[in-house]
Amino acid sequence: MLDIKWIRENPELLDQALAKRGAEPLSQSLIALDEQRRAVVQDMQDMQSRRNSASKEIGAAMAQKDMALAEKLKAEVASLKDTLPAAEEDERRLSAELTDALSRIPNIPLDDVPVGADEHDNVVARVVGQKPGWNHTAIEHPEIGEALGYMDFDRAAKLSGARFTVLTGPLARLERALGQFMIDLHTSEHGYTEVSSPLMVRDEAMYGTGQLPKFSEELFKTTDGRWLIPTAEVTLTNLVSGEILDQEKLPLRFTALTPSFRSEAGSAGRDTRGMLRQHQFWKCELVSITDAQSALAEHERMTACAEEVLKRLGLHFRTMTLCTGDMGFGAAKTYDLEVWLPGQNTFREISSCSVCGDFQGRRMNARYRNKDGKGTTFVHTLNGSGTAVGRCLIAVMENYLNEDGSITVPDVLLPYMGGLTRIEKAS
């Protein structure tokens, strides 16, 4: 969430930032709403001040036996008491309207974010590795998995409908191995603390990380009012909501391997085959809670941690700097990691790493005590996939495909595979 004080002082900067994201200017409507609220607050304060002073004057009038004045003052106090509740209700209504309006405004892009309309305007930051050197025909993962006999979309549809997958045998183990490898790497070498947290959260948690109120249609909600997390970013970031941390203890780095749940409401007709876009999928999430001074360096570090997963798997990928029109709602800058999928003959996103400034910290009311002792500051937050497990499984299947249809297990996953070095067709 943005600071209304900053908007009052920098209306042109807000509108310029919104224009970069392809949105309409909002500064004047926000400032007008805030002025209404502030006027009501001033009226309330004036009435409260007059009520207090009139109450004191009643005593003085009574002491001087001026009963007429005392009665007049009593009537004034009574009138003010009757008027104040309506003013207080106006203030609550206007404050709620302003908060709601502010909660729907996206984050301000950093100055070095390329300006653009959509994914076609993203910029390549670096390319790592090479395409597979084999000469046999590339095949997409649904055909590979079904031919092996370990990937079943029909039974998944029978159980749950579209956009679900059933994995069995060694392919299920390979998916599990990928998740274990990621969480082990990030905890043992990258300094992240593993967290096991709920998969269902309250409205406040979804609000804190920016999913609510704007994106409720993309989420799953339980009958008792809780939300299934679309990413562990929600739980890991909200661990510090409402808290005041010590700056000396920052950054806090958390990671979790969890299922994620998304309705894919805006993805009708996109990636309907296979595992690329699922309602339920495993993801290893990275979250950092840091101070304003360290956030940009932490962003580069987090991105490097996600890249290391793909490097150790020997996968060809590129890191993209997202343009203003393709960034997520809460991001100030985002790197996307896109892995090469031979079966599709293209790169596909496998991780997004974003720095959010104090956008989420303000929504969560999470602060840190400045080490110089001068007050508190909203925390800066970062989140990234380290990485999406299902998409990583797809990448391994397509890049480690052998001519006979089997899949070679990447060396880094062998310790997790119980001696299995190759996944072959089910007998």
Swiss-Prot record:
List where in the cell it is found: Cytoplasm
**What protein family does this chain belong to?**
Belongs to the class-II aminoacyl-tRNA synthetase family. Type-1 seryl-tRNA synthetase subfamily.
GO BP annotations of the record are:
selenocysteine biosynthetic process; seryl-tRNA aminoacylation
Top enzyme class, one word, equals ligase
Give the domain section of the comments: Consists of two distinct domains, a catalytic core and a N-terminal extension that is involved in tRNA binding.
Please identify the protein, giving its name as recorded.
Answer: Serine--tRNA ligase
Please list the reactions this protein catalyses: tRNA(Ser) + L-serine + ATP = L-seryl-tRNA(Ser) + AMP + diphosphate + H(+); tRNA(Sec) + L-serine + ATP = L-seryl-tRNA(Sec) + AMP + diphosphate + H(+)
Q: Report the superkingdom from the record.
A: Bacteria
Q: What does this protein do?
A: Catalyzes the attachment of serine to tRNA(Ser). Is also able to aminoacylate tRNA(Sec) with serine, to form the misacylated tRNA L-seryl-tRNA(Sec), which will be further converted into selenocysteinyl-tRNA(Sec).
Q: Which GO terms describe its molecular function?
A: ATP binding; serine-tRNA ligase activity
List of residues binding L-serine: T231, A232, E233, E285, S385
UniProt cross-references to Pfam families, sorted A to Z: Seryl_tRNA_N, tRNA-synt_2b
Designated gene of the protein: serS
Q: What is its main location?
A: cytoplasm
